[in-house]
Design a protein with these regions (language model features):
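Bacterial N-terminal signal peptides that target proteins for export
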Residues: 1-6
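Intrinsically disordered, low-complexity repeat segments enriched in small/polar residues
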Residues: 7-9, 26-27, 187
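C-terminal segment of classical bacterial N-terminal signal peptides
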Residues: 9-19
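Short hotspots in intrinsically disordered terminal tails
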Residues: 16, 113, 225-226
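N-terminal low-complexity, intrinsically disordered patches enriched in charged
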Residues: 16-18, 50, 215
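Extracytoplasmic copper-binding redox domains, predominantly the cupredoxin/blue-copper superfamily
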Residues: 20-151, 176
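Low-complexity, Ser/Thr/Pro-rich intrinsically disordered linker/stalk segments at domain junctions
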Residues: 122-228
Length: 228
């Protein structure tokens, strides 16, 4: 029994109302003289494609926002000394669009005092495709077709391709089962897999990693689940 896609269209049915990407601001505070060195809030949860913006609230010193493994580094040219690196200066901002993962970061100017975490789950939805399926007929030269809806789980872990030298790892499992690798160091941003059986709970996670390194990676994203 063959299958033919009708119109080539893939219809995406989001389980939740779609929302525009948003921006979350984190303040980078304080200096070594007056104290108060911190990122506030130190831990945030955002969605794939959201922007995190850091604002330097201090009047004197630079700050940076740097992923623990150097996967990304938001700094600047202000305030460098022989003892300290430069960063983004008082009153200025830096920002980044985020992919799925649990990303720990710190300030390179104040590495002991300033740390933060950004948690981003993968985005999951149900998609469907209309296909024309050939039905067997007793007379070989008579072809009959019927329309069938095929359902898919659609997984999105990033809104953009990663920077050069980076890639994404993606794993899935049925609830309670073993994790299975579905992508390794990919530069792609999404996938879909066909739903063969209904009423199954699928769980997925992803992370950002330096290609060629097993350890230079963000943490896995918070668990995301969907019922097929």
């Amino acid at each position: 029994m063959g299958a033919i896609t009708i119109g080539g269209a893939f219809l995406l049915l989001s389980l939740a109302a779609s929302a525009q990407a948003s921006t979350t601001e984190v303040t980078a505070n304080g200096n070594a003289f007056t104290g108060g060195l911190s990122f506030m809030p130190a831990s945030i949860n955002v969605r794939v494609g959201d922007t995190v913006r850091w604002r330097n609230t201090d009047f004197l010193v630079p700050h940076t926002a740097t992923e623990d493994h150097g996967l990304w580094d938001l700094g600047g040219s202000y305030g460098g000394t022989p003892a300290n690196p430069p960063g983004f200066g008082p009153g200025t901002t830096v920002q980044r669009v985020f992919e799925a993962g649990t990303q720990a970061y710190y300030c390179r100017v104040h590495p002991r005092q300033m740390h933060g975490t950004i948690r981003v789950p993968v985005s999951l939805s149900i998609g469907r495709k209309r296909v024309r399926v050939r039905v067997r007929h007793r007379r070989p030269h008579h072809r009959r077709y019927r329309i069938k809806i095929r359902r898919y789980v659609v997984v999105v872990w990033s809104s953009t391709r990663p920077a050069a030298g980076l890639g994404f790892d993606v794993e899935r499992r049925q609830a309670g089962g073993r994790w299975r690798v579905v992508r390794t160091a990919t530069t792609g941003t999404r996938l879909r897999f066909r739903i063969v059986r209904r009423n199954r709970v699928w769980q997925l996670r992803a992370r950002l990693r330096r290609s060629g390194s097993a350890t230079a990676a963000s943490g896995w994203s918070p668990l995301a689940s969907i019922r097929s």
